[in-house]
Amino acid sequence: VNFGFEQNLFLDTPSTLLMILAYTFQIYFDFSGYSDMAIGLGKMFNIELPVNFNSPYKACSVKELWQRWHMTLSRFFIQYVYIPMGGSRKGKARTIFNTFMVFFLSGLWHGANWTYIAWGSMQGLLVIWDNLGIVSVKGSNEKMPAKWYIPRWLGWIFTFGFFNLSLIFFGSSSMTAAIQLFKNIFAFKNTGYLFKLAANLDIPEFYLIKQVLTLKFPDMLQYAYVVLFLLLLIISAVVISRKNTLQMVAENPFRKKLCAWVVFIFVWSVISFSQVSTFIYFNF
């Protein structure tokens, strides 16, 4: 992902799309994982910390996504920005303005960069659109009836696709870099740069396979990296489609099989340490 954002001038359409998809998974697993760790550590000291994520990538509208993503920050902005500005008590126009300001300030909160402002503004505009009730997802819990309804699967595709594209602004260092990535997507070109992008996946578990391929089948190594990249994306997609950790623990607080898997993954993770991995949200 880091390599992709740095080399934005050279990416083609497939490599840009897959890089952004990888970033979408990375930022969620990074932040949600640390939030779960904090909740677990809190329980060790008999401190109940609030849930911060509730499977946001299962949302079928942008409004629903923000009811599931970084819920503590959302509550903060609602309590200290949205409600003091009048909330939804002063007419539709004021409600729209207040909603937009919440997301505008949320973008600014992440950093004084036009990319964050663009990202926050995009979220605000789509949440406002959802609030207008023109189009809604079938089976949603909206109080006001909508003019048109779409299937949940279509709502999910739009929501997940929109959030993917919006993260181009969030992850880019400048507006110029973000615009370049959009140009790459809509250029509809395939220059084979995906092979170079995937070659940056240098994980310890792949070391033995890499050595064998280098010695015996050097021409196959670049394809192996692409397969590994796609496999990681598929695994990530499967994980977010299943029950989250809090749901699993709530259904069955203690299972020997689950505990054994947790211990195994923890030990494996420690053994696989090869470099310092920074917490993305630590910067905000």
Name the predicted role of every residue range.
Residues 1-233, 242, 248-283:
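Membrane-embedded transmembrane alpha-helical bundles that form the catalytic cores
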Residues 235-237:
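Aromatic-enriched
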